[in-house]
A protein has these predicted regions:
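Bacterial N-terminal signal peptides that target proteins for export
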Residues: 3-15
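Mature, Sec-exported extracytoplasmic domains of Gram-positive
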Residues: 31-215
Length: 215
């Protein structure tokens, strides 16, 4: 698992900049589905304490930046917040701020009410589902199921079944879509569940939907 973790971490910066799945969490984003933690949703109940300002602070390691620097993410977030304010949609934000740290990491600042919404969004994105509808977001993916779920409800693995013909037609792209991208999203979910930033780990298995063989 450690070897797979390192491979996915190194590949994260290569792919996340081109991944459409991240669109639903771009900038301050829209509000994910309110009932995203239903029967088939996340079961982890961890909630970190609030600071003296009433904020929950979640820091993401550099291995989960998603292909950009922390400073770039902060600048983009501020720009998108200005646009949202002009459009009258800022109240839908799922966190209050995204700020770069001196060590190259970045931190989310959230209220206690916002925290479970962003946490649930990462849960769904980690298994290739739309954060709003919780439906699989890629047509060539027939199934995506979490595996290796621990006693705290934290998944450490993902099995993805794909249409092999489509997958191989653009293997470099589609391989990234079903491995690196969900690994980063699930890695962020793990951090939201209290996993230290240097201990996140995800193993992704891709299978041919017709034969069940591992690709």
């Amino acid at each position: 698992m450690v070897k797979q973790k390192r491979r996915l971490q190194k590949g994260a910066a290569l792919v996340l900049s081109l991944l459409l799945l991240l669109g639903s969490l771009a900038g301050c984003g829209g509000k994910p589905q309110e009932d995203a933690s239903g029967v088939d949703g996340p079961t982890n109940t961890y909630t970190p304490p609030v600071n003296e300002d009433g904020q929950i602070v979640i820091t993401m390691p550099k291995t989960l930046l998603g292909g950009k620097t922390a400073e770039e993410l902060e600048a983009e977030d501020k720009e998108q917040r200005q646009t949202a304010a002009q459009d009258g949609t800022l109240e839908q934000a799922v966190y209050d701020a995204l700020l770069a740290n001196e060590d190259g990491t970045f931190s989310y600042y959230l209220t206690k009410e916002q925290y479970p919404k962003l946490k649930a969004a990462y849960y769904w994105l980690g298994c290739l589902r739309d954060a709003y509808t919780t439906e699989i977001s890629q047509e060539f993916v027939t199934a995506a199921d979490y595996t290796d779920i621990d006693k705290n409800g934290i998944p450490w693995g993902l099995t993805v079944s794909v249409d092999a013909e489509t997958y191989y037609s653009m293997e470099v792209w589609y391989s990234a879509v079903v491995t690196v991208a969900p690994a980063v999203m699930l890695g962020r979910y793990q951090v939201f569940c209290g996993v230290p930033g240097d201990e996140w780990a995800v193993h992704v298995t891709v299978k041919d939907a017709d034969t069940g063989e591992v690709i």
